[in-house]
Amino acid sequence: MAAAGPEPRLLLLLLLLLPPLPPVTSASDRPRGANAVNPDKLLVITVATAETEGYRRFLQSAEFFNYTVRTLGLGQEWRGGDVARTVGGGQKVRWLKKEMEKYADQKDMIIMFVDSYDVILASSPTELLKKFVQSGSHLLFSAESFCWPEWGLAEQYPEVGMGKRFLNSGGFIGFAPTIHQIVRQWNYKDDDDDQLFYTQLYLDPGLREKLKLSLDHKSRIFQNLNGALDEVILKFDQNRVRIRNVAYDTLPVVVHGNGPTKLQLNYLGNYVPNGWTPQGGCGFCNQTLRTLPGGQPPPRVLLAVFVEQPTPFLPRFLQRLLLLDYPPDRISLFLHNSEVYHEPHIADAWPQLQDHFSAVKLVGPEEALSAGEARDMAMDSCRQNPECEFYFSLDADAVLTNPETLRVLIEQNRKVIAPMLSRHGKLWSNFWGALSPNEYYARSEDYVELVQRKRVGVWNVPYISQAYVIRGETLRTELPQKEVFSSSDTDPDMAFCKSVRDKGIFLHLSNQHEFGRLLATSRYDTDHLHPDLWQIFDNPVDWREQYIHENYSRALDGEGLVEQPCPDVYWFPLLTEQMCDELVEEMEHYGQWSGGRHEDSRLAGGYENVPTVDIHMKQVGYEDQWLQLLRTYVGPMTEYLFPGYHTKTRAVMNFVVRYRPDEQPSLRPHHDSSTFTLNVALNHKGVDYEGGGCRFLRYDCRISSPRKGWALLHPGRLTHYHEGLPTTRGTRYIMVSFVDP
């Protein structure tokens, strides 16, 4: 049942008994043009009890067009009901009634009343006034498709040939005396419904004619989004963005995200009027910057790190924490690890982390906290500490390659802001551009442009995760409840984002800088001894950083790092020491070395002409990964070293060979069954073994001191007849591939 409202007949009687309206020139008698009304005589009145981000966005758009704005209710208690869920809003009329007493006799004054939290102004006062004068009204209300709050009143509305039929009270514009005559009739409770009040006045035919009340049926001035999302598109000019109503071919001046369309308004507000333009880029990005002053200590930060699932390259992640370009004595570290598998990694890094940051706290898997409970605990640590000025949440699958990330986000001066991160070469990111009706992922029209950084700026989005910064004051004043992440059965990050959105706090995302990337974790198999080795497909950039020699690119670029110790035998850096060690350890962990016999059941024919003590990559499940390494790194180097040859980098024989004095110390002269052969030393001569090396008999050229991680690349069959020289002490390991057999 709607809140009690005034009866139309009673209102009409009251209005007829009032003194006559001050003379107002009929709109039909006024000149029709942009200069029909002086913009200086326009006043925008709005209502806001708190300076929310929605309110600041409204003011920002008003200031862009030089509107004069008067705000009612700032700092006062809202008693107008929960208008987001039910009827209410009468308090707005009471405030407006009092304010309009100032303008009751100003017949040339035009007032536009709009909401503020969910409104954006899209064009100038001049255009607004021109359209108002052309309407021929004394008071023009916005229109929508829904007869709210009483559907039973729908049949009393005049028929409309084209356009929206029903009144919406979120925006109206009119001559000050007319508005005063309307709102002075309000004598109801603050939580009675304002829209019902205006509706009942409008529905009286005599009153409608007497006061020249009308609706903006075709959204020439007011665009209410509820029920009209399919009608609205963005219209891009070089330095301006408008919304266009394609149903009526109009360019509205006021955009109102009424009802459940707040997120769609946030999307439009990223562009309108100049949030982002094709020529100017981000129009508002630098207006709120808070540059951290030099010579003064920066804000105190709680860095909350979460290891919630087995995560590749975790030791590298922990080391990157030490590289943040922010004074470590201003950072306290909270680390939650739910994975027993990662306890050794954290134990190795913990002494450094303890020495680096001002305070540290570790919560391990023995606490049996859920991901939501751990996040609530960390966030509350900042909330309860008045000295905690910023809360920086960081998941272990977020790779921050930009050490200035924390500083950049703080200087953006937003309540909540995340750095844009995505998986390498993928569209998977740490934000959603839109939500589906059930509040799960939906792709916004600009999602790809944002992920690929074709549009750069600071964006208002409905969902962020994995890395974000929140003001400590925001936690203490606007998000005081402890259970933010564990308050529902949904994913903790979804629960957090919903809690923030419901408070009217914007979730900002910055893609102004390259901040880093996300790791893929779903196929991370910890059954391997060194599971990171298998990440060449899922996380190729991180895999390369960990396993490909730091000088490989320089060698490929022709910087003089490739050597030729024998004719057509090339020597170049390929693998890191870590990869060499982990390959050897994987082989020894597997342990099923061949016996170096001619009979070999692993081969199609069951016979090996030149046997070695070895383990094939297929045996340890690493064949596909090694072939990807050949395609990505060995193939380009081969074509660089042998101009005119194009390799398919196909190899069916990929294996690690072990040489020992008491097992198989050497290998007799032979040709390889390949177009070219790759031979990588996996350990150090003089440290791990003595002797060894390779001799090319045709040239009587030997390589007696192989370098760990460096690859020999040489032709196989026909020309490069060679032998493995005896290993005299220790154990020598090499990785061999017969390529393009």
From Swiss-Prot:
Modification comment: N-glycosylated.
Catalytic activity: L-lysyl-[collagen] + 2-oxoglutarate + O2 = (5R)-5-hydroxy-L-lysyl-[collagen] + succinate + CO2; (5R)-5-hydroxy-L-lysyl-[collagen] + UDP-alpha-D-galactose = (5R)-5-O-(beta-D-galactosyl)-5-hydroxy-L-lysyl-[collagen] + UDP + H(+); (5R)-5-O-(beta-D-galactosyl)-5-hydroxy-L-lysyl-[collagen] + UDP-alpha-D-glucose = (5R)-5-O-[alpha-D-glucosyl-(1->2)-beta-D-galactosyl]-5-hydroxy-L-lysyl-[collagen] + UDP + H(+)
BP-aspect Gene Ontology terms: basement membrane assembly; collagen fibril organization; collagen metabolic process; endothelial cell morphogenesis; epidermis morphogenesis; hydroxylysine biosynthetic process; in utero embryonic development; lung morphogenesis
EC number: 1.14.11.4, 2.4.1.50, 2.4.1.66
Pfam families according to UniProt: 2OG-FeII_Oxy, GT_PLOD, OGFOD2-like
Residue ranges, annotated region (Required for glycosyltransferase activity): 28-293
Binding-site positions, UDP: 47-49, 115-117, 259-262
Signal sequence, start to end: 1-27
Residues the entry annotates as binding Mn(2+): 115, 118, 256
Alphabetical keyword list: Dioxygenase, Disulfide bond, Endoplasmic reticulum, Glycoprotein, Glycosyltransferase, Iron, Manganese, Membrane, Metal-binding, Multifunctional enzyme, Oxidoreductase, Secreted, Signal, Transferase, Vitamin C
Predominant subcellular localization, coarse grouping: endoplasmic reticulum
Residues that hold Fe cation according to the record: 670, 672, 722
Residues of the Fe2OG dioxygenase domain: 650-741
Domain characteristics, as noted in the entry: The N-terminal domain mediates glycosyltransferase activity.
Subunit-level organization: Homodimer.
Protein name: Multifunctional procollagen lysine hydroxylase and glycosyltransferase LH3
Gene from which the chain derives: Plod3
